[in-house]
Amino acid sequence: MADTRILPSQSNPEEGGVKRRALLAGAVGLTAAALLPAGMVHAEGFLMPEVPPLEKEDYAEARKRFHTNLLRKGPSPEKSEPLGTPAGAKRVTYPGGPDGSIELIAWLSHYEPTGKPKPAVLFLHGGNATGDGHWELVKGYWEAGFVVLHPSFRGENGQEGNYSGFYDETADALAAATYLENLPGIDKNRFFIAGHSNGGTLSLLAAMTRKFRAAAPISAGVNSWRYFARFEREARFDEENPKEFIMRSSVCFGPSLKCPTLLLRGTEERPFDADHQLLMDRVKTAGTPIDAKLLPGNHNGVVPGAVQESIKFFNQFT
């Protein structure tokens, strides 16, 4: 039977909607494609808009009213070991989780507060867990004079909390940002955000919620429908509610981006696509600078070079 899930703005006023038309179509032999609402395509278990909608509301305001509905609750889908303390890092905790109720582990680069405040980078890891290898990737930042905080998120590495797939994790990232910028000796006017893969996705959502000096998402996703079509088992929220996807998709909130941004990606990974271009077009309507750059490497191999490129970008604002 045809999927009955559709966006409210594209619903059919006819009683019974898509489900009723599916039954009628079965009687006359129409193809499944003919049953889809205009502008929608089939994904894995849900319908996906051909063009992601543009939300009029600012993302920060939308987050105040929206609460994700998790139908399945549990830890991150990625198996991982408990976190230790890698070389060059200080293990700290920050108040993440629901309303700051969970103490989550983060790694902070060693630094000494001085009379001159230091620039800082919040770096969000890829995947759905972290480890020493992720910390090694951010070494370039603290070698370049930035204080770096690398947070873990709820449900990762044996910690408390429920994995939500980008939404509640954004709240954790924002809590980590507040923790970092309020440390002694941190320059709030030179406070940056970066991240790789899933962390790049989160860095965009975070930069649409509050202001950073600049952002450098690496290999970021901008369309959550596409992500969860690939990783359907990670969708633990109510897939019948299109708002769940919208609130995880930065492309739907382009004008909300609150700082200059450089999108980075590897030449050997899935290229920038129409969704990235749509995001950039929507961001520019608000007058916020945004650019994209390809660097040599695949999805993981691009990270060291991208970190160096982000340092060059951030140094424009220091």
Give the role of each language-model region.
Residues 257, 263-265:
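Short beta-strand/loop motif that positions the catalytic acidic residue
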Residues 220-253, 259:
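Mobile cap/lid helix-loop segments that gate and shape the active-site cleft of serine hydrolases
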Residues 270-276, 302:
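Conserved alpha/beta-hydrolase "acid-adjacent" motif
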